[in-house]
From Swiss-Prot:
InterPro entries: 6-blade_b-propeller_TolB-like, PD40, Tol-Pal_TolB, TolB_N
Alphabetized Pfam families for the sequence: PD40, TolB_N
Gene name of the record: tolB
Function: Part of the Tol-Pal system, which plays a role in outer membrane invagination during cell division and is important for maintaining outer membrane integrity.
Keyword list, A-Z: Cell cycle, Cell division, Periplasm, Signal
Keyword check for Transferase: no
Any single GO CC term annotated in Swiss-Prot or TrEMBL for this entry: periplasmic space
Highest taxon in the source lineage: Bacteria
Organism: Actinobacillus pleuropneumoniae serotype 5b (strain L20)
Protein name (database record): Tol-Pal system protein TolB
Length: 426
């Protein structure tokens, strides 16, 4: 399929930043498709609850660690004991089942909120050694954020990689032919709220580097325009409204500029405009269509999709324009760069593919159907994307090593254009 026709068919169709009211319910909830066979075993013991607790904190932590693809939590039915503190951990019981790390904790009501306390225990020593511990208060409505905080700290202590479980995702839900919602939720689908509703298509949300704004495409003025939406104030500003279509926005790493695609001169080209608007600068002027820009972490390079050689493939060029070189192979598109700049996540052969930018080696990550719009967690560990299941568009999650796969089934709608937020906490 020609890139222009593909683009045209698409066109035709913590929490301090967020002032909207959220609920503990979700549009989408992770459902495991394929577990991890080679990940590190870990035990997350059910947290002792001193009074009623509105969420299963231990289960949330276990799910987070599993979703990363780095850990295989022991099933609760196979736990040899359920200690509430490190002092109660019998190392031999855990090493006998091949578990070196155990997470224990308690949740205690604190007048309008909860105190969440945990310990990460190393069972290779006897008595067991506490590797990390913490206790903090959270409002009742943010009990899941408390659990995600534990997950982040445990994940980082063991892997030396920052956890990304307190991040969010933005995505578009389409219901029928004239109902579109841009929604934001926790990375696992909970605490979802609507940013904007429209009777016209909404597309391609992208986060600003500080997580305070979303750039996206709207047809509300009967043409495709790029707007920037401030999530704190709710205000919106049109930043790209060239003649014809405007789409595929991407913030620069410093948040000062937005790259986007427009066909105002007939074919699609890449432009850059200030994040508050202004006069766009055209970066590409080659034959063929150029779209889907994505910045490198240092802002020096833009990756994009072009059909200048006959079929779509990923190219890269300097962020000021100029010559471009092919990167992804024929049929590749939707490229995003990992936060460390080492890998390119893209679509090739309708699958999510990872390309090592140093070696050129590629690895197919997904096993779903008609995949598109991959977005990478800020620590590079997980990828969310959209795929086709039956007659529906659904969100999927895959670890960046391809070992863990899950779907986020949604109720009553087509779920498209997922975008993973940056870190939202210090």
């Amino acid at each position: 399929m020609k890139l222009k026709s593909r683009f045209t068919s698409i066109i035709g169709v913590i929490t301090l930043f967020f002032s909207q009211t959220v609920t503990a319910e979700s549009d989408v909830v992770i459902s495991v498709d394929e577990g991890v066979s080679m990940a590190q075993p870990i035990a997350v013991v059910p947290f002792k609850a001193n009074g009623g607790v509105p969420a299963d904190v231990g289960q949330i932590i276990a799910d987070d660690l599993r979703n990363s693809g780095k850990f295989t939590p022991v099933e609760r039915s196979k736990l040899p004991a359920q200690p509430g503190s490190a002092a109660e951990v019998n190392s031999q019981q855990w090493t006998d089942i091949g578990v070196d790390s155990v997470v224990v904790g308690q949740v205690t009501p604190t007048g309008g909120g909860y105190n969440v306390a945990y310990q990460l225990v190393d069972t290779l020593s006897n008595p067991a050694t506490v590797l990390a511990q913490g206790a903090f208060n959270v409002p009742a409505a943010q009990i899941r954020q408390g659990a995600h905080t534990v997950s982040d700290q445990v994940f980082e202590k063991i892997t030396q990689i920052r956890g990304a479980f307190r991040t969010k995702i933005a995505y578009v839900v389409q219901r029928g032919v004239s109902s579109y919602e841009l929604r934001v939720s926790d990375y696992d689908g909970y605490n979802a709220f609507t940013v904007v509703k429209s009777k016209e298509p909404l597309m391609s949300p992208e986060w600003s580097p500080d997580g305070s704004r979303l750039a996206y495409v709207t047809f509300e003025n009967k043409k495709a325009q790029v707007v920037v939406h401030d999530l704190r104030s709710g205000s919106r500003r049109v930043v790209a409204a060239l003649r014809g279509h405007n789409g595929a926005p991407a913030f620069s790493p410093d948040g000062s500029r937005i790259a986007f695609a427009s066909n105002q001169d007939g074919e699609l080209d890449i432009y850059v405009v200030g994040a508050n608007g202004g006069k766009p600068s055209k970066l590409t002027a080659n034959a063929g269509n150029n779209t889907e820009p994505s910045w490198s972490p240092d802002g020096s390079t833009i990756y994009f999709t072009s059909d200048r050689a006959g079929s779509p493939q990923v190219y890269r060029m300097g962020s000021s324009g100029g010559g471009a070189s092919p990167m992804g192979g024929s049929g590749s598109y939707n490229a995003k760069v990992s936060s460390d700049g080492k890998n390119l996540i893209m679509i090739a052969g309708d699958k999510v593919v990872k390309r090592d930018l140093a070696s050129g080696g590629t690895e197919v990550l997904s096993s779903t159907f008609l995949d598109e719009s991959p977005s990478i967690s800020p620590n590079g560990i997980m990828v969310i994307y959209s795929s086709t299941k039956g007659t529906s568009k659904v969100l999927q999650l895959v670890s960046a090593d391809g070992r863990f796969k899950a779907n986020l089934p949604g109720a009553g709608g087509q779920f498209k254009f997922p975008a993973w937020s940056p870190y939202l906490t210090k």
